[in-house]
Amino acid sequence: MSAVTPLLDGLALRLYIQPKASRDQIVGLHGDELKVAITAPPVDGQANAHLIKFIAKQFRVAKSQVIIEKGELGRHKQIKIVNPQQIPPEVATLLE
């Protein structure tokens, strides 16, 4: 499975999360996953909440349309984005 998979109702992303980074950004490929750096620490779900907010902003969707399907407690996550309104350039190149 690749880092980005198109679905009928959106996209599935396989992510590798780097918490406590200096800034929020989509870094690029990390093996067969998309590396995302976020500023939040991995404490009490702060990193997951921050990740959902960041991804929702990047894809221009509501936070409720970003679903963590696997990896709630780890750095390796699989998320689903329902009907993204915009595709960030880092992700668009992986869809080609």
UniProtKB/Swiss-Prot annotation:
Signal sequence coordinates: none
- The lineage's top-level taxon is Bacteria
SUPFAM superfamilies in UniProt: YggU-like
Question: One of this protein's Pfam families, by short name?
Answer: DUF167
Gene Ontology cellular component list: cytoplasm
Task: Name the SMART domains for this protein.
Answer: DUF167
- List the Gene3D superfamilies: YggU-like (3.30.1200.10)
What family does the database annotate? Belongs to the UPF0235 family.
**Which NCBIfam families does this entry report, sorted A to Z?**
DUF167 family protein, PRK05090.1
Q: State the protein's name.
A: UPF0235 protein YE3436
Taxonomic path: Bacteria, Pseudomonadati, Pseudomonadota, Gammaproteobacteria, Enterobacterales
